[in-house]
Curated annotation (Swiss-Prot):
Oligomer and partners: Homooctamer. Dimer of tetramers.
Main location: cytoplasm
UniProt keyword terms in alphabetical order: Cytoplasm, Flavoprotein, FMN, Isomerase, Isoprene biosynthesis, Magnesium, Metal-binding, NADP
Family: Belongs to the IPP isomerase type 2 family.
Catalyzed reactions per annotation: isopentenyl diphosphate = dimethylallyl diphosphate
Function noted in UniProt: Involved in the biosynthesis of isoprenoids. Catalyzes the 1,3-allylic rearrangement of the homoallylic substrate isopentenyl (IPP) to its allylic isomer, dimethylallyl diphosphate (DMAPP).
Protein's name according to its UniProt entry: Isopentenyl-diphosphate delta-isomerase
InterPro entries for this protein: Aldolase_TIM, FMN-dep_DH, IPdP_isomerase
Length: 375
């Protein structure tokens, strides 16, 4: 099992880089328009992107979300990405640490991130199915201690497990196990999806049990069902997802509105198809605390090295900064105060789910500011 887990991590990475692994469905972020202010009454140099985040602080509201680790050949990737996060003062997550729990010799592939980023906000990672199958607070703490993490992500991936040839589609009792982890982990627990999006009901349930940090990881970006179907074809698996691999799930923008409605005081990462600073600005204006990217960071690193990744993330950061400036705010959470228009499919989906877009944009976003450091 240990060798299988490690080998699968390397296979995932190779497929992410070489195959079309993104959903054909949209994030729906294109249905968010931030109203431009032609008389902003602030200078660009006045703008600060610094935020408080899940018990820590970031110089910019960006997260390189976890995707890799657990094989000797990918250690350098975690090291390089972490060094970029350290330089920019942003957060970074590692991929699932299950392989290193099974084989402690692989811990170095994850520990490399902390070695390269002694001051960065570092997020550990374990899968929800492993909690359901027997992992306890002990393994959660092991993952945290392995990399001296500031938080731990518990990732939800029922779709991926259902189509993974060697998957573990076991979720019975998982909510209670997540609640136990949130109470005893010693660091904040971030519950994250993996490309199919969180829902209003799930976030409300978990928030009531003590979880305050979420990553919506919505539909519209990297799709792990599609990745597992592609892997399965090579291995002769009969499992085919059909259109489900492109269109099953909650698009990122819709998932974000649902999560913020369910938990106004939560810290929420919007990931899933975020590819540039406008995507990040739209997501934050819609109520996210931070935007998450993974696939673009890894692909840029593998194609152009560390400097390419640094250039990409600096560009996203600058585009986000100019968006804050062009609405007349000096703090990034000022985007929550900026007038926005939610229209088209996103507005229709919100209404169908019982969320009035006007109430959301004009009332809920402002009320949520009460819970955050906006000085």
């Amino acid at each position: 099992m240990t060798g299988d887990t490690s080998a699968r991590k390397l296979e995932h990475l190779k497929m992410i880089v070489s195959s079309k692994v993104e959903s054909r469905e949209s994030t729906l972020l294109e249905y968010v328009r931030i109203v431009h202010n032609p008389t902003p009454e602030v200078n660009l140099g006045d703008v600060s992107l610094e935020i408080d985040f899940c018990g820590g602080r970031l110089r910019a509201p960006l997260v390189i979300t976890g995707m890799t680790g657990g094989h000797p050949d990918v250690e350098w990737i975690n090291r390089e990405l972490a060094s970029v996060a350290e330089e920019l003062g942003i957060a970074i997550g590692v991929g699932s640490q299950r392989a290193a729990i099974e084989d402690p010799s692989l811990a170095r592939t994850f520990r490399a991130a902390r070695e390269a980023a002694p001051n960065a906000f570092l997020i550990a990672n374990l899968g929800a199915p492993q909690l359901s199958l027997g992992y306890s607070v002990r393994e959660v703490r092991m993952a945290v201690e392995m990399i001296d993490a500031d938080a731990i992500a518990i990732h939800l991936n029922p779709g991926q497990e259902a189509y993974q040839p060697e998957g573990d589609p076991f979720y019975r009792g998982v909510v209670g196990k997540i609640a136990e982890a949130a109470e005893a982990a010693g660091v904040p627990v971030i519950v994250k999806e993996t490309g199919n999006g969180l829902s209003r009901e799930a976030v409300a349930q978990l928030r009531a049990l003590g979880v305050r940090c979420f990553d919506v990881a919505g539909l519209g970006g990297t799709n792990w069902i599609k990745i597992e179907v592609l892997r399965g074809r090579k291995a002769g698996s009969p499992l085919e997802a059909g259109p489900l691999q492109d269109f099953w799930g909650n698009p990122t923008a819709a998932a974000l509105m649902e999560a913020r409605t369910a938990a106004p005081d939560a810290y929420i990462i919007a990931s899933g198809g975020v590819r540039n600073g406008l995507d990040a600005a739209r997501a934050i204006a819609l109520g996210a605390d931070a935007a998450g990217v993974a696939l673009p960071a890894i692909r840029s690193l593998l194609s152009g090295g560390r400097q390419a990744t640094l250039k990409l993330l600096k560009a996203i950061e600058y585009q986000l900064k100019t968006a804050v400036y062009m609405v007349g705010e000096t703090r990034v959470r000022g985007l929550w105060r900026a007038p926005i228009v939610v229209w088209g499919r996103l507005a229709e989906e919100a209404e169908a789910r019982g969320i009035d877009p006007r109430w959301y944009t004009n009332t809920l976003r402002l009320e949520a500011l009460v819970y955050k450091d906006v000085k």
